């Protein structure tokens, strides 16, 4: 399939031939949901820890005798009913990782990119270079595309673009090798350079 390529310097629009497997696949909602959930789950620390009544500090003696005090009966000061007592169903450290193999991950990424193209939320540009890390220069370039909140995907690490976009609200920059499904799904619009498209195609093939 062919994608239209926009240019900031010249008016003539060109096209870029890409693989259907990477940018023209059908949208698999169930797979995308599974991969996104697995990615988010993998980011959880899983370090939450609470103490049970067995682990919390305190005496094991009965606080007062069973009958005759007028108070409610109590067998331990470490009861979950008591202040500073243990937790009834205490949370323990756990691993939230969900298994997703490479084939599933690549298929989900291709599915998301293809759907973004169909919705016209993905714009390909020939290049995006800044002579200096100036926010104004980047803002003027993006203004020509008439986009709101945008995720910029570039090939490699461009210091000028990273610095220029740092204080722009609604603009984020990501390398094509490290872009993830959550960033793609959350993005309102996406601007991708030609080099980044080729890198994504290699990554998903």
Swiss-Prot record:
InterPro entries: Ribosomal_uL4, Ribosomal_uL4-like, Ribosomal_uL4_dom_sf. It comes from the Bacteria. PANTHER family: 50S RIBOSOMAL PROTEIN L4 (PTHR10746), LARGE RIBOSOMAL SUBUNIT PROTEIN UL4M (PTHR10746:SF6). GO terms for molecular function: rRNA binding; structural constituent of ribosome. The gene is rplD. One of the primary rRNA binding proteins, this protein initially binds near the 5'-end of the 23S rRNA. It is important during the early stages of 50S assembly. It makes multiple contacts with different domains of the 23S rRNA in the assembled 50S subunit and ribosome. The keyword Magnesium does not apply. Belongs to the universal ribosomal protein uL4 family. Residues 44-79 are annotated as: Disordered. Keywords: Ribonucleoprotein, Ribosomal protein, RNA-binding, rRNA-binding. This is Large ribosomal subunit protein uL4. One of its GO terms (biological process) is translation. NCBIfam families: rplD_bact. Part of the 50S ribosomal subunit. One of its GO terms (cellular component) is ribosome. Pfam families: Ribosomal_L4.
């Amino acid at each position: 399939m062919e994608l239209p390529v926009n240019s900031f310097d010249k008016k003539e629009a060109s096209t870029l031939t890409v693989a259907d497997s990477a940018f023209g696949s059908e949208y698999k909602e169930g797979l995308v949901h599974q991969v996104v959930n697995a990615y988010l789950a993998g980011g959880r620390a899983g370090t939450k820890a609470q103490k049970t009544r067995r682990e919390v500090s305190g005496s094991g003696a009965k606080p007062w005798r069973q009958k005759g005090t007028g108070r409610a009966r109590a067998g331990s000061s470490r009861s979950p009913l008591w202040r500073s007592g243990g937790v009834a169903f205490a949370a323990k450290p756990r691993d939230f990782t969900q298994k997703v193999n490479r084939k599933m991950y690549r298929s989900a990424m291709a599915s998301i990119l293809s759907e973004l193209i169909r919705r016209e939320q993905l714009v390909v540009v020939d290049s995006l270079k800044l002579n200096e890390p100036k926010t104004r220069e980047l803002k003027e370039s993006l203004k020509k595309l008439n986009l709101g909140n945008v995720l910029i995907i570039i090939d490699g690490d461009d210091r000028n673009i990273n610095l220029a976009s740092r204080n722009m609200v609604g603009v984020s920059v990501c390398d094509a090798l490290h872009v993830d499904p959550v960033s793609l799904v959350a993005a309102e619009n996406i601007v991708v350079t030609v080099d980044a498209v080729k890198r994504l195609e290699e990554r998903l093939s």
